[in-house]
Amino acid sequence: MERIQGRIVRGIAGFYYVATERGIIECRARGKFRKDNIIPLVGDIAEVQLVNEKEGYILEILPRKNQLVRPPVANVDQAIIVFAISKPEINRVLLDKMIVVAEINKIEPVVCINKVDMEKREEVENLINVYRKIGYKAVGTSAVTGEGMEELKSYLKDKISFFAGPSGVGKSSLINLIQSNIRLKTGELSEKLGRGRHTTRSVEFLPLDFGGYVLDTPGFTALEIDIPKEELRNYFREFIEFQENCRFNSCLHVNEPDCAVTEAVDEGIIDRQRYISYLTLLREVKEKEKRRYKN
């Protein structure tokens, strides 16, 4: 029987729907997965043995480049981290925390500042420039006027992406603007996949007309920074070129003497709010380490 490769775009009730060059194949996983305690995830690249044109068995899951727990997905390329410039007010610490979590998971963060149709235009441009200067992709968007949508689409093209951010920032509105028929497409795909047979909620990658997939549920519902405190500084990209000039190799850039990073902050080379985010997250990581050692 013929074997082909594809990406799992949906999994529910023991069925896995694999997007291949032949279309969507409904698959079961071989018993060895249960035996080895391996659960196929949405996003996995799978080797499938065809039973007929529409059905098959998953024989093998190829190595994952990353994996998230909530939502349970694998092999994501990028996180579109959405914050509104106002209503709700932007939380820079949370924004920077999401960037760190993305990079820990080997996911490229894309900063998206939404609701730019509101006032604060100068603030939006300054904020976008902060992140672009560091080396991140950053875009200002409006779900009302459509501003920035073409640039956002260019970042999504041929990538496996999910949207993350607080509630009320306009993630769903942006997804629906990216592709006007995405709800219809979801319905069509669900029909093909037989969603009517199952009532359990599942995660699903939705295909984009211009190439790529977007996850139908927000990512990063669990925001854990689970790294040693000494490693956090390496996830603030703008620190790296200065760190080697600190007096101490172990410098955490808090109140150590001759710290090149704090000097760069004082000179306005490193954005002060980014540095404040770092200090806040460092305290959080230290507290987590303390609790771990107590237990």
Swiss-Prot record:
Keywords: Cytoplasm, GTP-binding, Hydrolase, Metal-binding, Nucleotide-binding, Ribosome biogenesis, RNA-binding, rRNA-binding, Zinc. Residues 65-223 form the CP-type G domain. Zn(2+) binds at C246, C251, H253, C259. Binds 1 zinc ion per subunit. It is found in: Cytoplasm. GO terms for molecular function: GTP binding; GTPase activity; metal ion binding; rRNA binding. Its cofactor is Zn(2+). Its main location: cytoplasm. GO terms for biological process: ribosomal small subunit biogenesis. GO terms for cellular component: cytoplasm. InterPro entries: G_CP_dom, NA-bd_OB-fold, P-loop_NTPase, Ribosome_biogen_GTPase_RsgA, RsgA_GTPase_dom, RsgA_N. GTP binds at N114, K115, V116, D117, G165, P166, S167, G168, V169, G170, K171, S172, S173. One of several proteins that assist in the late maturation steps of the functional core of the 30S ribosomal subunit. Helps release RbfA from mature subunits. May play a role in the assembly of ribosomal proteins into the subunit. Circularly permuted GTPase that catalyzes slow GTP hydrolysis, GTPase activity is stimulated by the 30S ribosomal subunit. HAMAP family: GTPase_RsgA. PANTHER family: SMALL RIBOSOMAL SUBUNIT BIOGENESIS GTPASE RSGA, SMALL RIBOSOMAL SUBUNIT BIOGENESIS GTPASE RSGA 1, MITOCHONDRIAL-RELATED. This is Small ribosomal subunit biogenesis GTPase RsgA.
